[in-house]
């Protein structure tokens, strides 16, 4: 393959990201997710001539992994959970900094960040074990089912959420987010090593 499909996919992703970013810039403030998407796709497109040997076979996998990175990074100290930038419009501004509101969104953001990192890990695993491609793909996409159910149902568990200490939980969430970021970095390095050595694909 000449990699043209990968280049076109990146260009389409950049165009979509730029459209969303521009719309949000006009009518509101772009979220960290939208800014990061624009930056990542711009960077990858600019570097395509030098990275095509890596991105052509691994672009989808790396994109999924780094989607997880974007989500997990918003759990780190000084950041606001990514999902809160979208869910806050359902509530009055006075609640946007409420500890319970931020706790719920930290749970959902952490969960989705890990879902994307795990999906990327299943891609790498499948590349190393072609005979497992089908079952691993089933597990990879199957993760979306419980994640979607939790996203819908967890915010409704008001009684359980009130028993949680948001301050203590924040430290655990940040630790788990850090582990996810380390895992994502390791998986990215693995795809680069696989490209350089010619193994897997």
What are these regions (language model features)?
Residues 17-29, 151:
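C-terminal ends of transmembrane helices
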Residues 29-42, 57-66:
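Cytoplasmic-side transmembrane-helix entry/capping segments in multi-pass membrane proteins
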Residues 132-172:
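Alpha-helical transmembrane segments and their immediate juxtamembrane interface regions
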Residues 113-131, 187-200:
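Alpha-helical transmembrane segments and their membrane-interface junctions
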Residues 26-30, 49-57, 130-134:
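Membrane-interface helix caps and helix-loop-helix hairpins in membrane proteins
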Residues 90-114, 132, 162-175:
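Membrane-helix boundary/juxtamembrane motif in polytopic membrane proteins
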